[in-house]
Amino acid sequence: MKVYHTSNSIIVNFDFSKIGSCGGVQVGEGMYFSHSLSLCEGWSVRLGTVTFCVVDIDAKLLDAKRFFAKAPEFIAWLDAYGYRDEEGYLKESVLAEFEASEDAISVLKSRFYKETTNFDGIDDEEFDNIVVWNPKSIKRITQISA
């Protein structure tokens, strides 16, 4: 699917079918999104092969995502799907599906976000990066290419 956005008089043609699950895995193939212009500029120079985009996400969706990730609703959602054990930890069977426990949390948060806020993507709070699969979530994009 191709989507056209304008930002600062720049028309950007995105092929969302090429967006990967995370920037590191899809270097040279996907697109990498961030709120930080300086972060995008720095990494586009370092990697030289990735299209970086500064994204203005619908603020209501993003705020809800960051709040819900730490809220009782997320815990209740985990319990409803049987992801946690009696002590409140993720079950070993759930963790076994992923290479690292951080991956499990990230994927489960993404599933929760999609169900509860209709935001289809990953919000990496540590680095303030966003990987977006649902173009309807995007309000404005500024493209930075190496």
Where are these predicted regions, by residue range?
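Active-site and NAD+-binding cores of ADP-ribose-processing enzymes
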Residues: 1-26, 44-146
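Short active-site oxyanion
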Residues: 27-31
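Extracellular glycan-interaction surfaces
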Residues: 34-36, 41-42
